[in-house]
Each structure stands twice: as C-alpha cells, then as structure tokens.
C-alpha cells in the first residue's frame, strides 16, 4: 500500500509524484454474514502506545492487554464479543503469526485482517525458497488467516 502525493515544482511548473510505501504485507476481508452490536479494532501495542498510555479497552487478560490495543465505541459489547476463549485463541495465533497484525471487526460483519510481514501474499522472494517451500509458506499463511477468521465465527 502506498501513499502518493502530487506537487507542482515552482521552478519548472511540472507536476511530480512522491510515492511512499506505508504498508507491505498480507490482508484479507471476510464477510461473516451477520451483524454485531459494535465494531472493534485490535492492533499491536508498541513503544509509543506504552509511553503515551493510549486509551484502550482492558480485557482483564494480562497477556492480551500487554500485547494489544483494543478500541470500540461500546466497551461492554466489545468485551462480550472478545470472550476469554476467543482472546486465548487470538494469543495462540499471535504466537504463530508471520508479522505484526491488526484485526477490525465491523458492525456489518466485515472482518478485516492485516499482517505486516514485509511481503505480499504470493511474493516468491528472490529465489530463496524452492517450489515446495513456497507452497508450504503460502499454505501456512492462508491457514493462519482462516484460523483467525474461525476465531471470530459464531460470535
């Protein structure tokens, strides 16, 4: 994902583009075919979040609260969605993730998953992996996404 800014050089009058990469990784959208009482977003807790004490919802699970931020417009509904079992499942998947990830569940049942891995879904790399290794990596990454989707099914 890139951000593109266009600007006009005063000296020449020509338009130029400045393109900056803001995200490199895999993402997936899944429609869960049901509505939810609120939206929620989970993303990694990082240095500045810890220093600034970003306002996030605490789940009561110390491991989850140390690793992730949770926001929603309805704290009680978000905590009903994120049951203790679901939180544990997310933590297990976090340990097997191939990059930092974020989850966004919308009221309309759209579940967005993004893993900042530094490469796209089917990037072959620079010849470092043979075809069997590539197939295994692709299957492992897709399995991680489907496992995370399964964690949110039947909420």
Summary of predicted features, one role per range:
Residues 1-155:
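Charged, low-complexity intrinsically disordered regions
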